[in-house]
Regions:
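Alpha/beta-hydrolase superfamily serine-hydrolase fold, recognizing
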Residues: 1-395
């Protein structure tokens, strides 16, 4: 249990922005008829130092990993959920939150506190919503946040080689993407600079020479295959349509699925052509990356014809997908999840086991999507054990 002094300490944080004011890139959507412009709040962060870091001065000066420690702390970056179109990085601030049923304990905040007590620093980040940037804009934001903290590691008192990532729902999806499509991922080894830039976003980065690699990831009830989520629901005994859907997938990727000729589209993002939508649908799924399958199609843009395929050595890519390490991943999912069925995590777990990537999975009986039971003390402790066991330096 945390005493009052410790509670006050671990709940102190400082906020800032990891991208400059006025940031805009080719993925930002005002040119496509966006609902709201990109504001700097899209790139906000909260930073919570490891417990004890503030006892010997500011966090920049102490670099403490915990009480009595002088070592830089490992950092966990938390990516919030919200169907890629809402949510906030402020969700780990308060221990008590209001719900329609009344006040309840925020177990995600207790998770954050437990991490700090065990010598971890925690950062929570925002990213551009799907009505502010088309995919992979949100992934580029997440990777830029990793670069930001790594580049300023000394100022934050963190170890630049020990950065992990976690998140729930949409944040779980992006956590998996960051872990599986890292800068040294096997799929890049075939010599496809377009694919590398697609996932990395270095061209718009303030820190293009800094790695976006994460050492390990813990996605909670994350989406691993956007193509099958709707078929997974009825197979699991749930309704095809979920109240939280509201076109989350097509808003993120450009059109509905399967990708037909543009004249047949039911839903679409203005200004996104068929080739771009095809590319996004092929490259957005962590399950493919967990299996070592990277979509190497190269699109010219502006045409509804069949995309060309870049020449590459299939055998070489398969070998590299097996031999080159991707970040270890621990998956947490509720068995009663009617929004993102737990099979979405099971398939990733099976794929990683097949490739002999360190992995773990916790399936929570009776837990729905976003259920607080996914953050029980026992699961948080198991998460800490996994993080500490797999935290190999990435730079």
């Amino acid at each position: 249990m945390l005493n009052s002094e410790a509670a006050q300490s671990v709940d102190e944080y400082r906020s800032g922005f990891y991208r400059p004011e006025g940031f805009f890139d080719g993925l930002s959507l005002p040119g496509y008829g966006a609902e709201t412009p990109v504001t700097r709040e899209a790139f906000a962060y909260d930073f919570y130092p490891a417990r004890g870091a503030e006892e010997s001065g500011s966090v920049e000066e102490s670099g403490s990993a915990g009480v009595g420690s002088t070592e830089p702390a490992p950092l966990l970056i938390w990516v919030h959920g919200g169907a890629w179109r809402f949510g906030t990085n402020r969700g780990l601030r308060d221990v008590e939150i209001m719900t329609p049923e009344g006040p309840r304990t925020n177990r995600q905040t207790l998770m954050r506190r437990a991490l700090q007590e065990q010598g971890w620093a925690v950062a929570t980040i925002n990213y551009r919503y799907s009505h502010q940037a088309i995919f992979p804009g949100d992934l580029h934001d997440v990777k830029e946040a990793v670069r930001f903290f790594r580049a300023r590691a000394a100022k934050f008192g963190i170890d630049p080689g020990r950065i992990a990532i976690a998140g729930g729902s949409a944040g779980g999806h992006m956590s998996m993407m960051a872990a599986l499509a890292g800068p040294d991922a096997a799929g890049y080894a075939s010599g496809n600079p377009e694919l590398h830039e697609y996932y990395e976003g270095r061209a718009s980065s303030n820190y293009p020479g800094v790695s976006s690699a994460v050492a390990t990831a813990v996605p909670f009830y994350g989406v691993s295959d956007l193509r099958t989520i709707f078929s997974d629901r009825p197979l699991a005994g749930y309704s095809l349509v979920h109240p939280d859907d509201d076109g989350a997938e097509w808003r993120l990727l450009g059109c509905d699925y399967p990708v037909r000729e543009e004249r047949e589209w039911v839903e679409r993002v203005p200004g996104i052509d068929r080739e771009r939508a095809l590319q996004n649908w092929e490259r957005v799924n962590p399950l493919d990356l967990a299996r070592g399958n990277f979509a190497h199609r190269v699109y010219a843009g502006g045409s509804a014809g069949e995309p060309s395929r870049k020449n590459f050595d299939e055998k070489q890519t398969e070998e590299q997908a097996t031999d080159r390490a991707c970040a270890p991943i621990m998956l947490v999912h509720g068995i009663a999840d009617s929004c993102v069925p737990y099979q979405q995590s099971v398939r990733v777990y099976q794929a990683l086991r097949t490739r002999q990537v360190p992995t773990d999975m916790v399936l929570v009986p009776g837990a729905e999507h976003g259920d607080s039971r996914c953050f029980s003390p026992e699961i948080v402790q198991r998460m800490l054990s996994f993080l500490n066991a797999t935290m190999n330096a990435t730079v």
